[in-house]
Amino acid sequence: MDASLSPFDHQKTQNTEPKKSFITSLITLRSNNIKEDTYFVSELKPTEQKSLQELKEKLSASSSKASSMWGVSLLGGDDKADVILLKFLRARDFKVADSLRMLEKCLEWREEFKAEKLTEEDLGFKDLEGKVAYMRGYDKEGHPVCYNAYGVFKEKEMYERVFGDEEKLNKFLRWRVQVLERGVKMLHFKPGGVNSIIQVTDLKDMPKRELRVASNQILSLFQDNYPELVATKIFINVPWYFSVIYSMFSPFLTQRTKSKFVMSKEGNAAETLYKFIRPEDIPVQYGGLSRPTDSQNGPPKPASEFSIKGGEKVNIQIEGIEGGATITWDIVVGGWDLEYSAEFVPNAEESYAIVVEKPKKMKATDEAVCNSFTTVEAGKLILSVDNTLSRKKKVAAYRYTVRKSTTTV
């Protein structure tokens, strides 16, 4: 049964560079352009095509031992090699000498860091996966999404355990690079394909001063060795002071760079993320339906999106459920703060409606509801979300599956 077929019942009621903080580093980190950079060599300007050819020739004549990256031979002369070389050229405005220098340093770093084998290592940060930095799903354009959230480090014990000394810090840096390497492996590296990731950074409870050293090292590593790999940076739960800092830096950023920053104030994470990412790919803590264990069951089941206006109640009716069938559903409203309930209404007129979930006031921090119900007779399930006490419009999503009874008489 297709969830999208269910009807809705709407009821209105300068040169010297100062020491950068984590925030300023995030703002000034360069990103590429999803729409413009398709990597078709035929679409490059003649001067850019010439720069690409010169870089190939200089790299071939270079003394650099390593000439492959992410499993792609840079001297192979194929489309994948061109995509990677163009990333380094764009990072240095197509200046061949600067691009070659950057590329050679990156190749040396990858060899010393053993980056090619990094994704297979167990670095002992299982408890941070899915919390601090992790790849989860794709955006609506097919870009892998990397989530970052450093709020857990506001607790001194956690901070000391991860960043307590230089050895611990270096191990964390290696793990953070590992997360990005896993994201890079999800890219196509071909003209017209998906050649960059989306980065979502949650600024809630982020300890700014304490993370300065670690964050600056991470961002330096990424900027030096992963050029043009981040297409869009989405900042969620943005505190007021971040917006002030951004407004100060904004005049010095190019329009192209500014177009790739998305700022979302506290409480608007779901509303912002729904514009770029499908709800089944958004983590439950941000108003989506994705849980860490979902990937074990294959691709996520698509969800249907809807919105609830302020002063409105919405009833989602899932009809055509046979007797003895089991219906399982997920439903979420971004920043809930409203009342939710569920009931089953039999088709037979003499039967009574069954309360499946009593009306419950959902808190703003509540995650998606997942529940199931086995019917005795045919009927429909009604999921109700009551936003009549709020003036704020909210985004929401739901999905369901119906499993028919296998019992035979």
From Swiss-Prot:
Sorted UniProt keywords: Cell cycle, Cell division, Coiled coil, Cytoplasm, Lipid-binding, Membrane, Transport
GO biological process: cell division; cellular response to auxin stimulus; protein localization involved in auxin polar transport
Record's GO cellular component terms: cytoplasm; plasma membrane
Topology in membrane: Peripheral membrane protein
Protein family per UniProt: Belongs to the patellin family.
Purpose of the protein: Carrier protein that may be involved in membrane-trafficking events associated with cell-plate formation during cytokinesis. Binds to some hydrophobic molecules such as phosphoinositides and promotes their transfer between the different cellular sites.
Protein's UniProt name: Patellin-6
Name of the coding gene: PATL6
